[in-house]
Amino acid sequence: MVPPPPSRGGAARGQLGRSLGPLLLLLALGHTWTYREEPEDGDREICSESKIATTKYPCLKSSGELTTCYRKKCCKGYKFVLGQCIPEDYDVCAEAPCEQQCTDNFGRVLCTCYPGYRYDRERHRKREKPYCLDIDECASSNGTLCAHICINTLGSYRCECREGYIREDDGKTCTRGDKYPNDTGHEKSENMVKAGTCCATCKEFYQMKQTVLQLKQKIALLPNNAADLGKYITGDKVLASNTYLPGPPGLPGGQGPPGSPGPKGSPGFPGMPGPPGQPGPRGSMGPMGPSPDLSHIKQGRRGPVGPPGAPGRDGSKGERGAPGPRGSPGPPGSFDFLLLMLADIRNDITELQEKVFGHRTHSSAEEFPLPQEFPSYPEAMDLGSGDDHPRRTETRDLRAPRDFYP
């Protein structure tokens, strides 16, 4: 039985189901899948006990290879001052790190000298205190600061006048005049008018003296008890007499309450510098600077190979190696070479005699046969190594001829 062919509507529904299946699966899984952005390594920095944080960041090597670099910096809320990380709200001048004046320059210590002092860089380089030295204004001005006499002081100077002169209000000019002129009570003494001092005429001084005397007399006429004091206040006046004598002084009273503190005085002159202290410990390494921008650097092709370098030095002679195995014995030796050498020497002697004497001299010694004459020699024999022939008892005289002269 043949099954009926599928209808067009069923085929369309099957194709639609196959195409929508993956989409429905993604929609179903979308509720369980979430996207989360991982924080960078720089956001996960950990602050150590020394308040120094280490941050990792990608960087390039000189060869162009990507690697990881590390940067050290102070933790958040801290700043780097004198080799260590301190809180940002900390006063860097609180511990007096400078010799004279200290300024907090955006978290860094800025040391300066007082007016009238100069900074000596060479002494600071050698760690020889003091670093701030007094300026001798009198010597550096060539006598132009004061009219008469210039006296140098720590951080400043003052002017003095010679005998018969008085100093003016500017503290530098001197005019001729008496130091203590006769004052009639209506003129002020010129030498008393100085910067930072009070002055008064003789008339004013006399008036103040009379006023003080009157106050003393009124105080002496005051009653000793409260009743008489009340009468005195209500209007009962007691006439003062110039002949009244004060009574004996009373007993000292108890200690009164302490008074309020006076105004702050002006700072005194700086004292002598103390001996130099021991050098402090070496500070910790500062944080690494920002990484350079290498995005504009392009990596080029590799260049050609350069010429070979100079040869290195010869090494030392090595140790002698172990001796090798002993070889097999060689062929038997022969005296042919020795006889040839003796014949060559004899020939040289003969040529030397011909050159010296003009003719060949005959020796009474036995002549040696040449190798090519061995077969025709009457006593030709095999002169080998001596292993195949018995030893001869008779010997030949193989010495060279000794009679060179005729």
From Swiss-Prot:
Residues 270-279 have a biased composition (Pro residues). Detected in fibroblasts and urine (at protein level). Not expressed in blood or lymphatic endothelial cells. Disulfide bonds join 138-150, 146-159, 161-174. Residues 134-175 form the EGF-like domain. InterPro entries: Collagen, EGF-like_Ca-bd_dom, EGF-like_dom, EGF-type_Asp/Asn_hydroxyl_site, EGF_Ca-bd_CS, NOTCH1_EGF-like. Glycans are attached at residues 142, 182, 385. Residues 386-406 have a biased composition (Basic and acidic residues). Gene3D superfamilies: Laminin (2.10.25.10). Its main location: secreted. Residues 244-335, 360-406 are annotated as: Disordered. CDD domains: EGF_CA. The keyword Transferase does not apply. Residues 245-290, 300-333 form the Collagen-like domain. Required for lymphangioblast budding and angiogenic sprouting from venous endothelium during embryogenesis. This is Collagen and calcium-binding EGF domain-containing protein 1. It comes from Homo sapiens (Human). The gene is CCBE1.
